[in-house]
Amino acid sequence: MALQLYNTLTRQKDIFEPIDPANVRLYACGPTVYDFLHIGNGRMLIVFDLLFRVLRDLYGADHVRYVRNITDVDDKINARAAERGIDIRVLTDEMTAIFHEDAKALNCLPPTVEPRATEHMAEMIAIIEKLVANGHAYIAEGHVLFDVPSMPDYGKLSKRPLDDMIAGARVEVAPYKRSPTDFVLWKPAKPEEPGWESPWGRGRPGWHLECSAMSWKHLGEVFDIHGGGIDLVFPHHENEVAQTCSAFGHDVMANVWMHNGHLQVEGQKMSKSLGNFLTIRDVLKDWPGETVRFTMLKTHYRQPIDWTLSSLRESQRELDRWYPVARAFDQINPDNIPGIPSSFRDALQDDLNTPEAITILRRLYKDALETTDYAGVHLLLCGKLLGLFDQSLEKWKNWKPASFTVENVTFEDLIKEREEARAAKNWPKSDHLRDVLASYGIVLKDNKDGTTSWEAKR
């Protein structure tokens, strides 16, 4: 079947027709590097890594260009660097390196290009100059702002009427704005802040402008697919569309817009106040990256996902069963094997239908146990297309939580901590500690007298 993708712009699944099949172009909004990324950011990384893999499988690895940016100029970055008393570049380099480690642990392929916002000031200034020249931007009190009413179809991505946006604007609107909906393209920089010389004085760009400049530089004025989290549809992606289309005179910036759904934790919105805020690094301390990835893929990318310990536990169990079967076929000559089953490719080409693809993996595993021809090697090949089975069987079996050692006293301390959590009826912590120990091969048994015994199973 032909690749079909749900397009936020059209609100339907469209058959994907690249502008140039020999140069398929994909852009995804990357991180603002001021802190550790949370697990919801991890979902976005995995979703668009999967899309990158599917496009490479369909068009050839040399014919797909994936750009995922680094935002390294932002108010949050300035504030965090000041808080820590370090140079901004030191902070952004440190957090970018940590981000790369997290992405690698989740088995995400490196993008073709990973541009930094600070390296694209010339492109940003050029776009602003175009917008001012053609009447879509104006200068006011050292700022340059996009004139939203000058674009008749503003709101076409988010499907928000302009009148509703004006009514919903904050009561306190900067006095230099012509319309409450106008947004900043360039703003003055304080002496202690990073800044760049421009025709409008020393300053720095607005957030939305950065992605317009980087996508233009590396993918062109119009490209195939733009992606990100659902929270970016408005205002970030809407404003990208406004800037780029108004600057270059096209009706679209990207032909397809894709957005992954929200993530919640144990049925609740993730927040620091609830104590359930999880960074990618937090999760990777207790679970293998492939387990995290597999858990994400079990839910269709457009649906909300409920991040639970039980779902992680089940993913770990499935991969523990599948790994020995899949990796048993490492040495087989691929030239002697029929290609990936068409049903598996069809599932992924149906708007990245990973739940259906995983159902097929389960069927292949069952068939492999019954010695069906090629089922085991198909399990391996299909899993690899999802970004699974990337390790040797020995490495998979020997994985241990990074924060623990193998000495019994460590286990006893954890078991005691869990008993205290149970006594305090802190069930989430109790379940978490049980899962950590289980991933390390320690199986607990809660006794009637309130104590807990354990045995090593792995």
Curated annotation (Swiss-Prot):
It comes from the Bacteria. This is Cysteine--tRNA ligase. One of its GO terms (biological process) is cysteinyl-tRNA aminoacylation. It comes from Beijerinckia indica subsp. indica (strain ATCC 9039 / DSM 1715 / NCIMB 8712). Zn(2+) binds at residues 29, 211, 236, 240. The keyword Aminoacyl-tRNA synthetase applies. GO terms for cellular component: cytosol. Its cofactor is Zn(2+). Belongs to the class-I aminoacyl-tRNA synthetase family. ATP binds at residue 272. Binds 1 zinc ion per subunit. Its EC number is 6.1.1.16.
